[in-house]
Curated annotation (Swiss-Prot):
PROSITE patterns per the UniProt record, alphabetical: DAP_EPIMERASE
Gene of this entry: dapF
GO BP: lysine biosynthetic process via diaminopimelate
Protein name: Diaminopimelate epimerase
SUPFAM superfamilies reported for this sequence: Diaminopimelate epimerase-like
Keyword field: Amino-acid biosynthesis, Cytoplasm, Isomerase, Lysine biosynthesis
Enzyme class label: isomerase
Keyword Magnesium: no
Pfam families, A to Z: DAP_epimerase
Organism: Chlamydia pneumoniae
Subcellular location, record wording: Cytoplasm
GO cellular component terms listed in the entry, alphabetical order: cytosol
Length: 257
């Protein structure tokens, strides 16, 4: 593992997408260095940007444990904000392991990305044995990475250190496992979401693909057509909207100075 002094670490940028924190850089560390850097800076993942022949940049994403997810919605929005500020334009395209995405930088309070996929791969899974208060069935949907969505009357008192790993490693979702979202319906088109993230192996303040998964599952169940507001566990607000068959995720992005 390379030696990282405070001055070396300061060469990276720290971004937050609606509370989801990332280290962003244009040099690629070794996997063990990714784990170290994420631990030192207390972030959820590492974003590596490199030149691309088909987009403004290619984004390679690492979880804090060094694993590589194919997509991270808030990480992608952070990359879009970074590229917009570097290139001096608002229209940004990014190539990822999950495909080519386009986004738009309106302001630091509103960074949008088109998250549309041809197939969301939604499926219902029955849990024969489960701890309370998990329901008999959960929905799994693929929003670039797999997510299980559990709708419950109240989620603020849930112990995600128990319920999260139970579903994340459940044999139903083997061998790769899933991210797990616990969803509370606050009102029409208003959701509160808590997410246990695969690769972080814990709850995060927000999760973009999890917010998207939760909104898609609930809107399909209740027939909602309007934009859905997601109240994250960290207190930020995200919005999922649909227009002419396209699905958009938006929210704030901040950069630590």
């Amino acid at each position: 593992m390379a030696f990282y002094s405070p001055s070396t670490i300061s060469k990276y940028f720290i971004y937050s997408g609606a509370g989801n924190r990332f280290l962003l850089g244009e040099t690629l560390p070794e996997v063990e260095d990714v784990r170290f850097l994420c631990q030192e800076t207390r972030v959820d993942g590492f974003l590596y940007l490199k030149p691309s022949s088909c987009a403004d940049a290619q984004l390679i994403i690492f979880n804090s444990d060094g694993s590589r997810p194919t997509m991270c919605g808030n990480g992608l929005r952070c990359a879009i904000a970074h590229l917009a500020s570097q290139k001096g334009k608002s229209d940004i395209s990014v190539s990822t392991d999950s495909g080519l995405y386009s986004g738009y930088f309106y302001s630091w309070d509103r960074v949008l990305v088109d998250m549309t996929l041809a197939d969301w791969r939604a499926s219902v899974h029955r849990l024969e044995s489960r701890p309370d208060p998990l329901p008999k069935e959960v929905v799994c949907i693929h929003t670039g990475v797999p997510h299980a969505v559990v709708i419950l009357p109240e989620i603020s008192t849930l112990d995600l250190s128990i319920l999260g790993p139970f579903l994340r490693y459940h044999q139903t979702f083997s061998p790769d496992g899933v991210n797990v979202n616990f969803v509370q319906i606050l009102g029409h088109c208003q959701l509160r979401v808590r997410t246990y993230e695969r690769g972080v192996e814990g709850e995060t303040a927000a999760c973009g693909t999890g917010a998207l998964a939760s909104a898609l599952v609930v809107s399909n169940s209740y027939g909602w057509k309007e934009s859905i507001q997601i109240h994250t566990w960290g207190g930020e607000l995200m919005t999922v909207s649909q227009n002419r068959g396209r699905v958009y995720l938006q929210g704030s992005v901040t950069r630590d100075l």
